[in-house]
Amino acid sequence: MGMRRGRRLAVDVGDARIGVASCDPDGILATPVETVPGRDVPAAHRRLKQLVEEYEPIEVVLGLPRSLKGGEGPAAVKVRAFAQELARVIAPVPVRLMDERMTTVTASQGLRASGVKSKKGRSVIDQAAAVIILQQALESERVSGKAPGEGVEVVI
């Protein structure tokens, strides 16, 4: 089936901050969009809905945190719940979950290497993690010809 045309948004859900990234319609380059405050979840969903209306993505990909062994802990449960509600809020735009085992680690190492100071750097790190999630999603689709990760069912 090859690569579907169209923009995507990727979301890195953290406790305090939510990093957002997007890509061009050809799915070649993933770029940071913004960091959404994460503590007020309904407000975060509203802001993400506005971004979906603005960017008109064909799908939104969320990073699903797993342990290195592939198990799911409390963080994954939280992301699944967030994804479920987001899917309802932005329907009919599909939401997908992508394994993000290493992304935040990779993002913070990359930024540390480039000299980003931590407090201000945190929101940059969230966006960088979202960029990496999106790059992995695009790469996975390029290689497999299938939509990345797993779909989130909309429960009405």
UniProtKB/Swiss-Prot annotation:
One Gene Ontology term of the molecular function aspect: nuclease activity
Biological process terms in GO annotation: rRNA 5'-end processing
Compartments where found: Cytoplasm
Gene Ontology CC: cytosol
Gene3D superfamilies: YqgF/RNase H-like domain
Keyword Cell membrane: no
Primary localisation category: cytoplasm
Enzyme class, spelled out: hydrolase
EC number from the UniProt entry: 3.1.-.-
Keywords: Cytoplasm, Hydrolase, Nuclease, Ribosome biogenesis
Function: Could be a nuclease involved in processing of the 5'-end of pre-16S rRNA.
UniProt record similarity statement: Belongs to the YqgF nuclease family.
Protein name per UniProt: Putative pre-16S rRNA nuclease
High-level lineage: Bacteria, Bacillati, Actinomycetota, Actinomycetes, Kitasatosporales
